[in-house]
């Protein structure tokens, strides 16, 4: 069962939290397509005037972790 991408986007835009550790494997089935997932989220954030200050992607055997800091 995957988490809802829309809930993540809502949190990234409207939550007061600015630092996130996102396990992408909780949102998509094929973790090797993580770059497409990240690009989609970045596109939405840009349209919502949320700037990415810092980001790092950690690739693990079964997980892809996206560490993200945003400015709203």
PLM features per residue range, with description:
Residues 13, 17, 45-48, 68:
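N-terminal regions of proteins, emphasizing targeting and processing segments when present
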């Amino acid at each position: 069962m995957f988490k809802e991408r829309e809930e993540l986007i809502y949190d990234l835009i409207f939550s007061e939290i600015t630092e996130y550790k996102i396990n992408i494997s909780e949102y998509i089935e094929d973790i090797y397509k993580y770059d497409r997932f990240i690009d989609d989220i970045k596109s939405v954030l840009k349209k919502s005037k949320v700037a990415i200050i810092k980001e790092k992607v950690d690739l693990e055997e079964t997980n892809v972790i996206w560490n993200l800091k945003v400015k709203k």
